[in-house]
Regions:
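Active-site entrance/lid segments in N-terminal catalytic domains of soluble metabolic enzymes
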Residues: 1-132
Length: 132
């Protein structure tokens, strides 16, 4: 599954933030049966999640593509950096589908406002790009 920190399919930008890496995603997608995009999964609304560095083992660091030894807490941002609106999400879905050679794309989401879900559906209909 793909969350905001892009573990297993991302790396670090020059400012230290986590970003999606298409090459790493394509390489690792061969081991997946499907792709799941996680939306609105921050541990605290608007703040994302935090894994203290003391709890990060070598195995966790390897799985999350973090440098070892880990010197900083691992932060999952509140929002995705690969897209910022429903139409860009549709483009991201198309990118994932292409890079994974047609694997099914799903979404896991939690919405606080019905209009947010309506905006997603409207973008899916208008672009023809949607989860499977």
């Amino acid at each position: 599954n793909i969350g905001t920190a892009y573990f297993g399919c991302g790396g670090f930008a020059s400012d230290g933030s986590r970003v999606f890496d298409p090459d790493l995603f394509e390489e690792n997608s061969q081991y997946a049966k499907m792709i799941e995009i996680k939306l609105s999964q921050g541990a605290k609304p608007g703040h994302g999640g935090l894994l203290p560095k003391e709890k990060i083992t070598k195995e966790i660091a390897d799985a999350r593509n973090l440098p070892w030894p880990v010197l900083h807490d691992c932060v999952s941002p509140a929002r995705h950096s690969a897209f910022s609106n429903p139409y860009e999400l549709c483009e991201f879905i198309n990118t994932l589908r292409t890079l994974s050679k047609g694997k099914p794309i799903g979404m896991k989401l939690c919405m606080g406002h019905p209009e947010e879900f309506a905006a997603l559906v409207r973008a899916f209909v208008e672009t023809g790009e949607a989860p499977d």
